[in-house]
Amino acid sequence: MDNTVLCVRWGDKYDDTYVKKLKEQLDRHLTVPFNFYCLTDNPKEEYDIQLPTLWDEHYRADKNMFWAYRKCYMFNTDKHFPQIKGSKFLYFDLDILIHNNIDCMFELDMYRPYIVRGWWND
């Protein structure tokens, strides 16, 4: 499968029920086949992938590096996450709500990154 959805559950802000709810929403609102992976420091499910120990190296409080910058490293699949399959990637935060079909997101030109913020309001 070329289509892949990624999320991150790291720390204790969100528990694994958020990951399950995201997966359920994707199953309901994607009609195209897709891979699903959750990068986590506490793997429990078959779709969970252990975060590498170097994950914390991408956070430097003294440099005021925003935590989200570390998310960018998940797209370096060859180096950090060789088990992630696919060529088209979507990333979702765990607190997202998906209300309608999102197949069109996999039709976007994947050669450039998109950040969708408040799509519902556009």
Provide a role label for each language-model segment.
Residues 23-27, 72-75, 102-106:
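Short amphipathic alpha-helical segments and helix-helix/interface helices
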Residues 54-85:
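Short, structured active-site "lid" loops
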Residues 89:
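Short aromatic/hydrophobic "clamp" motif used to bind/position activated sugar donors
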